[in-house]
């Protein structure tokens, strides 16, 4: 089962991400706590990890993320913050993903 390079693990740790685990199909599950307290999980392939994170960042849709949580709140979930906080948090998540992708791409160039 492939695992992440130490250089990538160091970047994740510095940015307060943790590895939750590896899957049998070659993926890694990452966990990060957003400023609003969301337990944000990302699952990507270990192979070409920097590109996988870049693609995830490019595909992340803050509006879709906000809508998911607004719907959860409408369906009775109690721990969802208000719309303004959700909007700010989605922006913060996008920023974190972009910065993480950039740092990983830079590390990849140096290898």
Describe each PLM feature range.
Residues 10-13, 55, 87, 105:
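Compositionally biased amphipathic helical and low-complexity segments enriched in hydrophobic
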Residues 36-88:
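Intrinsically disordered, low-complexity regulatory segments enriched in Ser/Thr/Pro
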Residues 5, 83-86, 90-100, 104:
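Long amphipathic alpha-helices with heptad-repeat character
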Residues 23, 41-43, 53-55, 97, ...:
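Generic local-structure boundary detector
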Residues 1-37, 74-77, 107-111:
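Negatively charged, low-complexity tracts enriched in Asp/Glu with abundant Ser/Thr
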